[in-house]
Amino acid sequence: MAKTNIATVAPAEQELFNKQEAFFLKFRKQILIAVAALIIVVGGWAAYSNLIAGPREEKASTALAKAQEMFGQGEFQKALNGDKTTEGFLAVAENYGGTDAANLARAYAGLCYANMAKWKEAVTYLEDFSAREDMMISPAVTGALANAYANTGDIDKAISTFKKAADMADSKAEDEVNNSLSPSYLISAARLLESQNKKSEALEIYKEVKEKYVNSASSQDIDKYIERVSE
């Protein structure tokens, strides 16, 4: 998850945006006059959506993509804060509030902090991410948040959040079974329960993983976990 790009801008889309931006700059006065008239007629929402929100989202996505490249190269500090030519995730989150790119930037900022072992900061930004109704990204960010909770010593919250991440992943999966994400989150929750000497609760989770996620790589070693907490 940590090194997967969760938003990219296709070259064709970027070229189209560049052309639209150039057109807007050339005919700014005429367009703004027309926009003013449109605001009077329809209350401004269509104008905002088409001429401001759209290009703003494109700009935010472009800035995000550049920071993602740094993230993918393991340059977490630079991805977070940017450099002379690139806005980092913190700037994207701050400057493009309300866009999908800003939301993803908050998740990435949290992941950067996590990779730098700055767990309290990681919690702050991962909590600020607004989950969507998807099968992979939102559950993965929630799982990262659970890991951050564990590393700040909030074990109970980590356990419940790992379970939540698994539920989120399953809810959008075919047959409500996400073999890619859910088993690892549940196993993480169970191992934390073991650390609290709650073996019976951990056992129930391990049994669930064995029975429900039979096609998952994570379930291949599940018998040794079951044996350990059954002793």
Regions found by a protein language model. Give the residues of each.
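Short solvent-exposed coil/turn linkers within tandem alpha-helical repeat scaffolds
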Residues: 54, 93-102, 116, 131-138, ...
